[in-house]
């Protein structure tokens, strides 16, 4: 059965580019999102997120009649679920959005349909999704019941893209395809090959789920090593960026760069999925999470020390000292603030500091709710002119372009080594 109509559930940072990629190959794509503003924006041929080149692809797809956004699922030949999978307060995975998405498409499923879960999920999530669908549609058979003869094929296929490079990597990167049966894997592979130039690597759903978690946990552990080095070097009076540059001249050493912590919807979240299911075994992964989650507190301590030095060297009162935080996104040159340590640092500083806290984030037009009423959003030039203490949190290209002579401040906390 060919895939004439493809539905993508969730039109966020992964879902919308995926929908656009299929639509660019002249497939009819129905994008579904509960956010009415996002749906309206997309149907105008515009986008509600920041991602290079995505706006052009969406505009062409909408104007050509290949991409339509709606708030409720419609019949299709393939459904891709790309909704958030956050964790709860106890770091347990929260699958409520996946469950809701599965139950929303259940009424429109028909024999021969393919359902793919893309959302990063704990091991066993695909099987759980299949169970939810089976309970909602007892008139259809599913892989856990009928194997290769199932009416509905189900697979898990995680994304592997870098924000800011999504429209390139979505097409070029290899894809892990984890079907509940070999037929499920084959059909999922055929679907992605509509736009994929990379290789479809087939496995089972549980291995595919663990593969995604492993990739991001590996990166988290390596970042934790760099962040721990930054703490040690600060204590020992060593420039951590020089140290890493020298150590990386060893042909088998590749230390990552430290920062204010780890953010985003993947690296800061996914390791907890492994830890929650394997608390006694995932000791290294757990420790890395604690190191990275603790780094923002260390940054705030450095800021407090800088303010104390500023007060000791000037005749200003604490209420007169202005602190400027540069960057809120979880990585450079994007607008995504999810799980961003920079947001947490800015909030902690603003809650502690009696003076004004300025924030510079060139990729957003308004502050997140967690910072409203606490900080003031400023442009780069104004912040440099007004602030007494500078805090570099995200190495956006705009910040890297700041000339040394434009920085007059003596008190600087640079978590990214931009002004080293």
Curated annotation (Swiss-Prot):
Pfam families: UDPG_MGDP_dh, UDPG_MGDP_dh_C, UDPG_MGDP_dh_N
Domain of life of the organism encoding this protein: Bacteria
Sequence positions that bind UDP-N-acetyl-alpha-D-mannosaminouronate: 160-161, 212, 216, 219, 250, 252, 263, 330-331, 416
Biological processes, Gene Ontology terms: enterobacterial common antigen biosynthetic process
Classification via Gene3D superfamilies: Cytochrome c1, transmembrane anchor, C-terminal, NAD(P)-binding Rossmann-like Domain
Gene name as annotated: wecC
Organism for this UniProt entry: Yersinia pestis
Enzyme kind, highest EC tier: oxidoreductase
Pathway it works in: Bacterial outer membrane biogenesis; enterobacterial common antigen biosynthesis
Function according to Swiss-Prot or TrEMBL: Catalyzes the four-electron oxidation of UDP-N-acetyl-D-mannosamine (UDP-ManNAc), reducing NAD(+) and releasing UDP-N-acetylmannosaminuronic acid (UDP-ManNAcA).
Name of protein: UDP-N-acetyl-D-mannosamine dehydrogenase
Family classification: Belongs to the UDP-glucose/GDP-mannose dehydrogenase family. WecC subfamily.
Presence of keyword NAD: yes
